[in-house]
């Protein structure tokens, strides 16, 4: 690094860094004995934080190996060897600071090495320094100092050989990531980090699974924040200013992304996620962004902070700047749009696109320095992605968030089958000698200590099975067996959770249970009567007191047929549910018999023409037509000659014949 003196022409160029012959002056600063160069109190070397000067030992060793050797030729002026500095000596910026390394062309390297000449005030030959600066890592605080992080071209006039002292470095190495420059017959590689430092542990994917999901969620949230900020800037700024800022930032975006890819090519693994190639995290910029750079930061948010892809089409993800204020594209209008499985699939699909595009962009940026250009067919990438295997299968193969390939925790599911009795050894072998609850490996000599769960049909360790007892739904539905069996802690929590839930429809699950359990069949008959009479009472304005009686029962017993919970079936077995249903039915029948509104809503049997009013809830003596839902006596009803169905058919034919007669 070279700093240019802009104050006086007679003052020689005072570089930042140098190598001194004085062993006491090892910090690379100008000698305190040199009174011609005043001390700059705002020098960035003194104002920068101390922690920024620390480099890893491998980087220090690399810089020490790359230190050039200084050749001193003559000394006829007042400058002594202690005041003479080499441009690439030991300094806080060279040894202690992790400065971003930048590739320099060969011509630039030669010019930089030849321009480090020292002139005298008597001859008046000042070194002219031409700086081409693309970006500055830190703001300038001192007029004598500058920090340049990109390529520089330094040229100086030829120094006459009449005794002037000059310093010429024998080597100058500047590389970025995997590049190496061969200078002075020696090849120096800047990638001195060992490959073992980036090798993940064997179980890193399993241990960091929650980080994997957390990074996905955080990335999507950061994308939403970026969209909101971009929308706010668009509303406040004018169209011309926004267009000018976007036009200026597009070129900077390409250069910045190229620099970031080169810097991160050695270590593309996120330090906290445990998986490779998913997130490119870059240290934040120190300088305060100006008004014209806000739009640039918004457009570069996908590359500076995290690689985030919008939940849209594949074509939208191929754009270099993925910032968009339209967040409605990521909204999925489906019945189960917020389910965990669907969200995981969507996140995996989007991030898989992101990984593929990251590789494409890396090849594109690498082709800028290559002799031949690399042609990337993005249509082929899209076709390969669409023709890949199912997303669900890829999730199972690449990352099993629920356990491992040999073990998975039990699922929250209702089991309606009774497990056949099997030998303990066979069941444990089927479990791969793992505890079904926590996945703890079990040695063969401790197999006898495992505890069996009657609900799941698997063996658990002592920590996952505390000998809790519960009724098994499959045994109740198949055998009307209410005995309690030992279940695991997981099964106990599951059964307690569904204990009051009406999820068992006996008509579909176990229709033959009514013939096995007589008390259940009697409850079904009363339930059917209450189902019809409750509908009638809801239409009567005088049945408020009677409807309050139904509040003693769960709503599903009087509003749906054949629907029970485990608690209801236990009450049926104990004989507690049938008496309660009979009391409510008795009160309802008394109201219907004495209410004129309810009597007016009854039916008259059209077969026997009896004056007695009949109702659908009288299931013992009445029957309803399945087509017109009319009510008749059971002994009088004939489905093939329903009078109401005949009238409806005749009326329909009459209506169909009227338009044809009018025409």
UniProtKB/Swiss-Prot annotation:
A cellular component term, taken from the record's GO annotations: intracellular membrane-bounded organelle
InterPro entries per record: Autophagy_HostDef_Reg, RH_dom, RUBC_PIKBD
Transmembrane segments: none
GO molecular function, one term: phosphatidylinositol-4-phosphate binding
GO biological process: autophagosome maturation; autophagosome-endosome fusion; autophagosome-lysosome fusion; lipid metabolic process; regulation of glycogen metabolic process; regulation of lipid metabolic process
Region Disordered, residue ranges: 1-36, 65-136
Modified residues (N6-acetyllysine): 484, 534, 574, 634
Taxonomy, superkingdom: Eukaryota
Biased composition (Polar residues): 80-93, 105-130
Alphabetic keyword roster: Acetylation, Autophagy, Cytoplasmic vesicle, Lipid metabolism, Lipid-binding, Membrane
Keyword Zinc among record annotations: no
PTM comment text: Acetylated by KAT5/TIP60 under autophagy induction, promoting autophagosome maturation and lipid metabolism. Lys-484 and Lys-574 constitute the key sites for tuning function in autophagy.
Region Interaction with UVRAG, annotated ranges: 196-235
Intracellular or extracellular location(s): Cytoplasmic vesicle, Autophagosome membrane
Membrane topology: Peripheral membrane protein
PANTHER family: PHOX (PX) DOMAIN-CONTAINING PROTEIN, PROTEIN ASSOCIATED WITH UVRAG AS AUTOPHAGY ENHANCER
The protein's role, per its UniProt record: Regulator of autophagy that promotes autophagosome maturation by facilitating the biogenesis of phosphatidylinositol 3-phosphate (PtdIns(3)P) in late steps of autophagy. Acts by antagonizing RUBCN, thereby stimulating phosphatidylinositol 3-kinase activity of the PI3K/PI3KC3 complex. Following anchorage to the autophagosomal SNARE STX17, promotes the recruitment of PI3K/PI3KC3 and HOPS complexes to the autophagosome to regulate the fusion specificity of autophagosomes with late endosomes/lysosomes.
Oligomeric form and interacting partners: Interacts with UVRAG; the interaction is direct and promotes association with the PI3K/PI3KC3 and HOPS complexes. Interacts with STX17.
Record protein name field: Protein associated with UVRAG as autophagy enhancer
Source organism of the structure: Bos taurus (Bovine)
Gene behind this protein: RUBCNL
């Amino acid at each position: 690094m070279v700093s240019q003196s802009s104050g006086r022409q007679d003052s020689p160029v005072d570089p930042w860094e140098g190598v001194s012959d004085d062993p006491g002056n090892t910090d690379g600063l100008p000698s305190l004995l040199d009174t011609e160069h005043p001390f700059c109190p705002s020098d960035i070397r003194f104002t920068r934080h101390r922690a920024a000067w620390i480099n890893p030992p491998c980087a220090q060793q690399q810089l020490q190996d790359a230190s050039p050797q200084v050749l001193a030729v003559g000394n006829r002026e007042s400058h002594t060897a202690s005041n003479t500095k080499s441009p690439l000596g030991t300094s806080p910026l060279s040894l202690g600071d992790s400065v971003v390394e930048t590739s320099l062309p060969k011509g630039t390297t030669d010019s930089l090495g030849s321009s480090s000449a020292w002139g005298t005030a008597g001859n008046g030959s000042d070194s002219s320094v031409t700086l081409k600066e693309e970006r500055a890592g830190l703001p300038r605080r001192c007029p004598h100092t500058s920090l340049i992080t990109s390529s520089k071209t330094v040229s100086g006039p030829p120094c006459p050989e009449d005794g002037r002292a000059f310093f010429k470095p024998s080597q100058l190495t500047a590389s970025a990531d995997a590049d190496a420059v061969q200078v002075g017959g020696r090849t120096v590689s800047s990638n001195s980090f060992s490959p073992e430092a980036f090798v993940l542990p064997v179980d890193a994917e399993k241990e960091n699974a929650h980080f994997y999901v957390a990074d996905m969620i955080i990335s999507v949230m950061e994308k939403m924040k970026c969209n909101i900020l971009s929308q706010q800037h668009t509303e406040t700024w004018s169209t011309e200013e926004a267009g000018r800022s976007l036009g200026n930032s597009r070129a900077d975006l390409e250069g910045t992304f190229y620099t970031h890819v080169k810097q991160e090519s050695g270590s593309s693994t996120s330090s906290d996620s445990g998986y490779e190639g998913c997130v490119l995290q870059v240290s934040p910029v120190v300088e305060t962004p100006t008004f014209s750079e806000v739009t640039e930061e918004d457009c570069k948010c996908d590359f500076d902070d995290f690689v985030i892809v919008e939940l849209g089409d594949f074509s939208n993800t191929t754009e270099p700047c993925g910032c968009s204020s339209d967040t409605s594209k990521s909204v999925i209008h489906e019945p189960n749009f917020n389910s965990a499985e669907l969200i995981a699939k969507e996140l995996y699909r989007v991030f898989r696109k992101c990984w593929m595009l990251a590789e494409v962009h890396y090849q594109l940026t690498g082709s800028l320095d290559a002799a031949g250009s690399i042609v990337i067919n993005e249509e082929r990438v899209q076709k390969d992605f669409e023709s890949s295997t199912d997303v669900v299968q890829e999730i199972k193969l690449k990352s099993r968030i629920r356990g491992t390939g040999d073990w998975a925790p039990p699922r929250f599911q209702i089991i309606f089958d009774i497990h056949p009795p099997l030998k303990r050894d066979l069941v444990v072998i089927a479990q791969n000698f793992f505890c079904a609850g926590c996945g703890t490996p079990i040695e063969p000599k401790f197999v006898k200590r495992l505890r069996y769960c009657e609900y799941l049909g698997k063996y658990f360790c002592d920590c996952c099975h505390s000998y809790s007892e519960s009724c098994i739904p499959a045994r109740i539905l198949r055998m009307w067996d209410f005995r309690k069996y030992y279940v695991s802690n997981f099964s106990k929590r599951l059964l307690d959770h569904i204990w009051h839930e009406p999820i068992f429809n006996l008509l579909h699950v176990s229709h033959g249970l009514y013939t096995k359990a007589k008390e259940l069949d009697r409850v079904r008959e009363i339930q059917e009567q209450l189902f019809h009479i409750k509908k009638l009472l809801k239409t009567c304005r005088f049945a408020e007191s009677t409807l309050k009686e139904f509040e003693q029962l769960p709503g599903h017993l009087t509003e749906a047929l054949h629907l029970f919970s485990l608690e209801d079936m236990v009450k049926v077995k104990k004989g507690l549910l049938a008496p309660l249903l009979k009391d409510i039915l008795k009160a309802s029948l008394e109201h219907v018999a004495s209410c004129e509104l309810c009597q007016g809503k009854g039916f008259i049997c059209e077969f026997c023409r009896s004056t007695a009013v009949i109702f659908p809830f009288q299931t013992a003596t009445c029957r309803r037509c399945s087509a017109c839902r009319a009510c008749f006596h059971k002994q009088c009803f004939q489905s093939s000659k329903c009078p109401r169905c005949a009238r409806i058919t005749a009326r329909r034919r009459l209506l169909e014949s009227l338009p044809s007669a009018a025409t």
